[in-house]
Amino acid sequence: MPEAPKIAALEVSDESLAEKNKNKLQFIEDVTTNADDVQRRVLEEILSRNADVEYLKRHGLEGRTDRETFKHIMPVVTYEDIQPEINRIANGDKSQVLCSNPISEFLTSSGTSGGERKLMPTIEEELDRRSLLYSLLMPVMDQFVPGLDKGKGMYFLFIKSESKTPGGLPARPVLTSYYKSSHFKNRPYDPYTNYTSPNQTILCSDSYQSMYSQMLCGLCQHKEVLRVGAVFASGFIRAIKFLEKHWPELARDIRTGTLSSEITDSSVREAVGEILKPDPKLADFVESECRKTSWQGIITRLWPNTKYVDVIVTGTMSQYIPTLDYYSNGLPLVCTMYASSECYFGVNLRPLCKPSEVSYTLIPNMAYFEFLPVHRNSGVTSSISLPKALTEKEQQELVDLVDVKLGQEYELVVTTYAGLYRYRVGDVLSVAGFKNNAPQFSFICRKNVVLSIDSDKTDEVELQNAVKNAVTHLVPFDASLSEYTSYADTSSIPGHYVLFWELCLNGNTPIPPSVFEDCCLTIEESLNSVYRQGRVSDKSIGPLEIKMVESGTFDKLMDYAISLGASINQYKTPRCVKFAPIIELLNSRVVDSYFSPKCPKWSPGHKQWGSN
């Protein structure tokens, strides 16, 4: 008899969940059907509430909220254009510089300016918008994979280092902000956010303790796991590599029901203690699977009820798809949403599609969206280079959300509730289709990025400056760099940057290996703070490698490119290569290889903040 109320409650719960899902799907229908009206209202709301903001008054908007006036008067801007305003707020200016609402914190972008993370202003209510987008994901997924409410998600989620601006505002990545918010920590019970990792393990700032405890909890609940994932593909693969290295200790903890003494965070120990119980049978199972020579399909072997892997595999993350396929035995790789530090943008309405066919439907009430047409030069390029400043004609070329054309590429421009106006995000998108009147975009690339392993983004100019700094080590030996290129090597985890160097040797003095190691370290020291954080704090990037190639290698590279149809007159050495045959050609002519001997310098915060 005591069981009857439970069953009744479960039925009500199932019914209300179905109703909730239905309402969320109807919301998507409504906002995509009325996309242009929603966009008009969003812009009016942003401009009316910020009518007295200094930035808008300076440009002469004078409280007007219509699209035509806004587009005519307000310039399209990059981060550098608004950096003076950002710095004022960071330094403690509490006047209405960019936004009428108080700036609650800065979200640190993985994009950089002057080698430092960009600071994106945000306001308290943005958490509601982010939570809204998250709430759409599982109702969409439920249409394709029903029953996910009956089990758990094993997600490896981490917080990153944060700092405070001189004015006392937190500066941290968007996900760190979200995980530390009451929206996440005090979220009401929801079967779709029922994770194997207790909050305390996610919020542990020690990356080793966080990973160890999350993996242990995932193994203890292995039969309940229906989906696995992380934010980026690279992060999920790091978790599997961690298991590969630490399974004996994890199995020992499961066998004895005692958490490793290396886990010293008391809140983590307490949370894991609620889950960890002595289970010799499970320990035997984990050991027998992990001892096998092949780790192919290890995800489906250890977590047999897993339906899919939820990770971002678009853009530069696509390089990890073969590794994920190997570990998961070809489970669907699902990209659910598209977001950045500036704004949360949209959702994937066909989550089980192939990674190459992923497209995101922009949700029209997240921000006001505009699109700058991208005209690509034909030719061999590894990134799309976009002009920094726009001409008056180009400023007028921007089109609204509902006016984009199928197959055309655009750079995304946003106006947000938190004080960004006609801001160039830097993402290049291609129109792949439409959901009602709202376009669906596939992500093409981040503008100007040539190298990326994790959340780092290194562009050609930055790489060139880093190489220029490094070659000063060669001057005493009467040697110079005649040519170079690079690639992101993800064949081992963590991945690392590789540079191919061809030298011109004028002197007779042999160059000691330590000099080339110094070159590696100088390049790393010259790269942006996101790269250096990945090396030092997150351990998501391995030591940089310089491979010395035979004389004449880059002539061979040019010959190869010309044989594929490149124009001899227009050919220039690519500063980054991704095409496997080219990498093979370069590797076949390597004579020596050197790695950075230690981690570069890095500390949280911006260098201009001093010790803050």
Swiss-Prot record:
Expressed in cotyledons, stipules, true leaves, hypocotyls, and all parts of the roots. Not detected in flowers. Its EC number is 6.3.2.-. GO terms for molecular function: indole-3-acetic acid amido synthetase activity. Pfam families: GH3, GH3_C, GH3_M. It comes from the Eukaryota. Keywords: Ligase. One of its GO terms (biological process) is auxin-activated signaling pathway. Induction: By auxin. Not regulated by light. Optimum pH is 9.0. No activity at or below pH 7.5. GO terms for cellular component: cytoplasm. Belongs to the IAA-amido conjugating enzyme family. PANTHER family: GH3 DOMAIN-CONTAINING PROTEIN. Catalyzes the synthesis of indole-3-acetic acid (IAA)-amino acid conjugates, providing a mechanism for the plant to cope with the presence of excess auxin. Strongly reactive with Glu, Gln, Trp, Asp, Ala, Leu, Phe, Gly, Tyr, Met, Ile and Val. Little or no product formation with His, Ser, Thr, Arg, Lys, or Cys. Also active on pyruvic and butyric acid analogs of IAA, PAA and the synthetic auxin naphthaleneacetic acid (NAA). The two chlorinated synthetic auxin herbicides 2,4-D and 3,6-dichloro-o-anisic acid (dicamba) cannot be used as substrates. Involved in auxin signal transduction. The gain-of-function mutant dfl1-D (T-DNA tagging) has a short hypocotyl under blue, red and far-red light, but not in darkness, shows an exaggerated dwarf phenotype in the adult plant caused by the inhibition of cell elongation in shoots, and inhibition of the lateral root growth without any reduction of primary root length. This is Indole-3-acetic acid-amido synthetase GH3.6. It comes from Arabidopsis thaliana (Mouse-ear cress). The lineage of its organism: Eukaryota, Viridiplantae, Streptophyta, Embryophyta, Tracheophyta.
